[in-house]
Design a protein with these regions (language model features):
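Contiguous segments within soluble domain cores/interaction surfaces
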Residues: 4-119, 123-126, 130-135, 139-155
Length: 155
């Protein structure tokens, strides 16, 4: 039997605006993030459109998933963590959150070695205070065949 995916948690003043699979975003550039597998994170030109609002995600190349949050205050030096299945340490980086501005925390399956089924947890902390925690259940790529980030196929 599968373990129940934990419900999303949002701290005081944090709204989880969207959770799920989103349209492949336009990448504006990258930002160094040495404590991640790739060593950088992608920066988006604008918040993407979420098309499948769910926490079950198929492990397929090109699929984008994550969350869009809005905070009621500016928060500097937020520690962002991604826990992948079987990892002893999370991938992490720091970012700033601006009051009232939607902030994307996402992941795109770009490489075969990233296609890891199991629970993927996205968290953020302001010091020791948890801002959010959202767990996605990544399923084998053969499952949920209709779920895609290619929005051209959906129009």
């Amino acid at each position: 039997a599968f373990a129940e995916t934990p419900a999303p948690v949002a701290g005081a003043g944090i709204v989880l605006q969207s959770i799920g699979v989103y349209c492949s975003p336009e990448i504006a550039g990258t930002e160094a993030a040495p404590d991640t597998e790739l060593g950088y994170i992608n920066l988006m030109t604008a918040p993407p459109e979420f098309i499948f609002r769910q926490t079950d995600v198929p492990a397929r190349l090109g699929l984008s998933f994550g969350i869009l949050i809005v905070a009621d205050r500016d928060i500097a030096n937020v520690r962002v963590l991604t826990w992948k299945p079987g990892a002893t340490d999370p991938e992490s980086w720091t970012t700033d959150i601006v009051a009232g501005e939607p902030k994307l925390r996402g992941f795109v399956f770009e490489y075969e070695n990233e296609l890891i089924p199991g629970p993927w947890r996205m968290e953020a902390y302001d010091g020791d205070t948890q801002l959010y925690s959202v767990t996605f259940e990544v399923l084998p790529g053969s499952e949920l065949p209709s779920v895609t980030s290619n929005c051209d196929l959906l129009s």
